[in-house]
Amino acid sequence: MHPEILSLSLFMFVTSCSPGPNNIVASHSGFNHGIKKTIPLMLGVIFGFTTMIAIVNFGLINLFKLYPIIQKTLIFTGTVFLIYLAYKISFSKISTQERSLNPVTFIETFMYQFLNPKGVIVAIISVSTYVEAGNNFLNYSLWVIGVAFVFAIISIIFWVLIGKFMSKFATNDKFIKLFNYAMSLLLLSCITTFYL
């Protein structure tokens, strides 16, 4: 596995740190609620994504191969949820005085990982590419899960900090509204990549 660590790390860096549903929602939460109130969301993404990769690794990938409709259903359900989330973000009533819209909880974010089309696709690709059956199966599996865990931490912290940094410019309601619209549009743009 050692020669593939660099390739796996690069793959996880690009897929984890590029804009996607988790990162956009994390940035939005960092912007509107700050770092401390976003910690449950961050932990939900980190542990949910890692758990999902482990579950795909230890059997779900075979279920997807036998019954592709399950994967398609997950992607469709995740798409519907993203549209709902984009709507909620876009039309949230937030002002510089009072930031309503409660932060996303640990459980909500943890459970969303199993509906997150980008995350499911990343899990399937990483497991099918970097985990081999045989004597080293467990070793390869632990490497993939460990690298995914590390990059989930790096990515989510980075995006929350971007949101927090942007909040310094939120001196009026118009800026906040524009930021929320931008986050909504980015979230909706993620959907197109699920069907390419």
State where each predicted segment sits:
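Select subsegments of transmembrane alpha-helices in polytopic membrane proteins
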Residues: G44-G48, F110-I121, N180-M183
